[in-house]
Amino acid sequence: MRDRGGARAIVVRAASGSVARGCNCACAAHAIAIGPEQESQQGSDMTDTASQIQDKPEREAMEYDVVIVGAGPAGLSAAIRLKQLDPEISVVVLEKGSEVGAHILSGAVLDPCGLDRLLPDWREMGAPITVPVREDRFYMLGEGGSVRIPNIAMPPLMNNHGNYIVSLGNVCRWMAEKAEELGVEVFPGMSCSEIVWGEDGCVAGVVAGEFGRNPDGTPGPGYEPGMELLGKYVFLGEGVRGSLSKQVIERFALSEGREPQKYGLGMKEIWEIDPAKHSEGRVVHTMGWPLEKNAGGGSFIYHLDNNQVYVGFVVHLGYANPYLRPYQEFQRFKHHPMVAELLKGGKRVAYGARAITEGGWQSLPKTAFPGGVLLGCAAGMVNVPRIKGNHNAMLSGIHAAEAAHEAMSAGRTGDVLESYDAAVREGAIGRDLKKVRNVKPIWSRWGLTASMALGGFDMWTNTLGFSLLGTLGHGKSDAEATEPAKDHAEIVYPKPDGVLSFDRLTSVSFSGTNHEESQPCHLKLKDPSIPIDRNLPVYAEPAQRYCPAGVYEVVEKDDGPEFVINFQNCVHCKTCDIKDPSQNIVWTVPQGGDGPNYPNM
């Protein structure tokens, strides 16, 4: 990773010229702009503009029974279950990371219920799941102190007894090995850039493995058009705000009648700490400072083995103040006396960030569509109070595999797997989400204190099988929740000390992030004039603050401000696609293998 001074950046000027340019490329407008015609084609493709004005390249095709996009816990569970049901079923898993696990970032405290169902003997199979939770602690933080909340005051579902502290990336690497042993084909480094549509309008496959476009989108000397991977069914397990999932949700109106999806930004570091301060199996969650009234969110500190701890911070993206900087809130959190004492004398070894779905039951779209399904976080199956979704992701993969196997056994293909959607809503996943459905909207409306009191009460009553509140709505999307800058005071953050807190570019260097600079920018602007002409005067252009990797900058020049996109820094969190108040930024996949390379996240 290099900073903007040594890497190709995309620069957008004001509307007086409406010009987008790259410092190394005269035609960079093609690399970032999505015109009105392309914007109206929701559900066809959102690849770079240059490729859309050319004829489609000729591509070879490979056919499978099931094509799975994403080698996360959901996609790999589906692949394994399909092969368990019928070893003759052909299954391929496509992963955009350089290896399985490279793009996986999660807390993570794993509820093993999904894995128990998928691989009951996982404990004897060498799974990298070896640190059981031994202690739960909950704290309310003030700026200078903390109050521990008695465990007995917490709803039973917040108890982590029987769960495990894991590196989800390593769990996925292990699951991929088990899938391959069963005959699943797993291809890392394969970004899925387009959907292949069937003649009847169903999802028939995906385009994967396109490489070698120039910055302006035209084919370069070593251009590879990729392949069409066609399936009787296509499972989308891309994770939060997946680029293909987003198209499918719009095309088939899967969110019609649902509440807007809500999101958080999760940031995580791995620290090696003093053995005297380490307590393997301890799980700590905090609320309150430094966010307090500015936004919802909280932290986690998980003590795994080898004197390491996961230190994480989540900021709900429905905050109103465009001056808020989620990354700096995380860095400030580590200076709390309780946290600083834990980390004193330690060493940070990794950093990453990823959006989290938080809408829950009210926002869950229809999960089946003609030709495929949405798995796990692509649909939004996270239990927000528990900060857990991996168990539901695994269960969704199992349900999808069973529904597709039943359909193919009956000679069906390309239809809507209604039994999958029913299994998600009426089974363990639906019950898990329904119990906590009101916590997030209570927090969003009335703040932390109300969420602890009223939300906690609602979780208690739901444990008993009823709710006095019914089902509360979310109202605005996170983008719509952003208010004009004139209504808020700018937030002054302390400078990082280089010991506990760090600047964004330094942190990105701890994520292993890398992008080939000669490719088109994967962060598209529907209208290149909006950042400077609208977002800057109205919202003080929040992209320069909400991005946890320093991708976006507003640089003052003699002839006016410029909007700069340092796409090489992108850690694929998707926050820009979610939080941009004008919904002008569209996150698309870069070349396969690019992005972060998380070792043990």
Language model features with spans:
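C-terminal auxiliary extensions adjacent to catalytic cores
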Residues: W443-V499
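Predominantly flavin-linked oxidoreductase catalytic cores and closely associated redox partners
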Residues: G169, R173, K178-E341, H399, ...
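N-terminal Rossmann-like FAD-binding beta1-loop-alpha1 element of flavoenzymes
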Residues: Y64-V92
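FAD-binding beta-loop-beta segment adjacent to the flavin cofactor pocket
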Residues: A353-V384, S507-S518, P531-Y546, E553
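Active-site-proximal substrate-binding core of FAD-dependent oxidoreductases
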Residues: G380-R386, I398, E402-G447, V564-N566, ...
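A short, basic/flexible loop-to-alpha-helix module at the beginning of a structural domain
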Residues: T47-E63, G217-G226
